[in-house]
Amino acid sequence: MDFLSEHWLDILTTILGLLYIVLEYRASIALWIVGIIMPALDTWLYWSHGLYGDAGMAVYYTIAAIYGWAVWRFGRKHGQQTGGQMPITHMPSRLYIPSLVFFAVAWAATYYILVTFTDSTVPLLDAFTNALSFVGLWALARKYIEQWFFWIIVDAICCYLYIVKGIPFKAALYGLYVVIAIAGYYKWKKMMKQ
């Protein structure tokens, strides 16, 4: 019983995370509803384990999920007929450099905040995953297929971090996320051609 009382939030957010990734894999707009609830709960989980960057990122995810839902529901790409959801597309090459610059600035800023204002024991990796997650979530909201590449990297590093920090269910979830992100890329690629 001690195990469950110690890990109940980890278990709950892991279940929600499984639902989220299945919905993302299917390119279902319902992913954004789960994407509001899960990170709201993750905020407390991460904070209680000293993953302050991840806690801050979870707050961002909660807010960004509202944006993602609105873009998927009401946004349209150039040339798309009115109505329907936004199609899956490639990230325009003109956005590569700005995305890389944003990532680098976000990584440096997050690292500085974690080192200066927290007692984080993993500031470099925590900041890295947070900065890349900003870019990944933006790419997901725009329905760019390349978002999967960002998540493969983020998920692999987070799996390691959660093992180190003693959050076993999240670690297993993020290990599974790596596999699903690889499969998701190919699924979305197939969906793009339909």
Describe the predicted segments one by one:
Residues 43, 62-65, 181:
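A short structural micro-motif
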Residues 29-30, 42-60:
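Helix-loop junctions on the outward
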Residues 1-27, 31, 38, 75-79, ...:
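Polytopic alpha-helical membrane-helix bundles and their juxtamembrane interface segments
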Residues 36, 44-46, 73:
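A broadly tuned "polar low-complexity/structure-edge" signature
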Residues 60-79:
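Membrane-water interface of transmembrane alpha-helices
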Residues 38, 53-56, 71, 169:
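Short, flexible micro-motifs
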Residues 15-19, 57-66:
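Alpha-helical transmembrane segments and their immediate interhelical/interface regions
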